[in-house]
Amino acid sequence: MKKLFLAFGILISSLAYSQQEIKLDIADALIIRSIEFSYENYLTEDSSFGISALFNLAKQDITFRYNENTMITPYYRHYFSTNEQWNFFGEGFIGINSGKTEVTNLGGSGVSYKKYTDGALGVAVGTKYVASGGLIIDLYAGVGRNLFGTDSPILVPRLGLNVGWRF
């Protein structure tokens, strides 16, 4: 019976601590015409892990766009301050990305596109604001390096202005 009460108490206390977030990157949606969703789960008060999914909606021939058409990014964040509303973090991520790279045809007779899929390892830094009602705003910037393909871009950007909800 004691074990049952202990298990029930741990379950209730874990639900009382808001430790999950869902977010949408509004900067990507408004500026670059792409959608990025994120989910983040807190391990402790100063560390979390999450996953982001980026889908590029811009056409391939537009000059100002991400190179990647899709990118799935698992990440780990460590928070450096103990302030509950404003917090600074460092992030390590692995970005699995795919897209098309521009290839000039032999003889200069036009341009074609070659598909690629690659994995990037990178770091980012950022800050996060958490309102008492659960609203989340975070801003981050970082860069990763593609490791495997020769047809993929060398560097992968990780930029974002996320708005979301903690529950």
Where are these regions (language model features)?
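Transmembrane beta-barrel architecture of outer-membrane proteins
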Residues: 32-34, 69-73, 118-122, 156-158
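Outer-membrane beta-barrel strand-turn architecture
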Residues: 41-45, 80-84, 129-133, 167
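Outer-membrane beta-barrel "beta-signal"
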Residues: 155-167
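Solvent-exposed loop/turn segments connecting transmembrane beta-strands
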Residues: 23-36, 60-67, 84, 147-156
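Membrane-embedded beta-strand positions of outer-membrane beta-barrel proteins
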Residues: 24-26, 51-53, 74, 88-94, ...
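Outer-envelope beta-barrel architecture signal
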Residues: 4, 18-22, 45-49, 84-90, ...
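Sec-dependent N-terminal signal peptides
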Residues: 3-14
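Flexible, solvent-exposed loop segments that connect beta-strands
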Residues: 54-69, 96-118, 149-151
